[in-house]
Amino acid sequence: MTAMLRSSAEEIFADELAALAKGDDRERPANWKMSPQAVVTYVLGGRAPDGTVIQPKYVGNRRLIETAVATLATDRALLLLGVPGTAKSWVSEHLAAAISGSSRRLIQCTAGTDENQIRYGWNYAQLLAKGPSREALVLSLIHI
């Protein structure tokens, strides 16, 4: 049996996400569920076009969220950097939920995470048996 500590952002705030997406008639980047403006409203709070109250998920500098969303709307990556406890994981989960509809494929790192750990891992039984080979390589989520 698998137990979840808590439901995902897209499950907890499904009504808010649906209300924002339904009333969102602005241009959306390719593969986005809603416009950048609606994503900012989802994260910072406000009202959906139908009057649904959108709870703030982040209380802080509005420009930080606007810049993060604008960066994601381009072809650039976004790296949230800061001391522990500053809501980086929380914000990234909500951005993923609003943009793609799923926050299940987040990649979380620490200061000690190597770039290669993000890209792939090794099946050590195969590595010992056959040496470094494609069969021993285990691709990470970014390749799925």
Give the positions of each predicted feature.
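AAA+ P-loop NTPase catalytic core and its hallmark functional loops
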Residues: 2-142
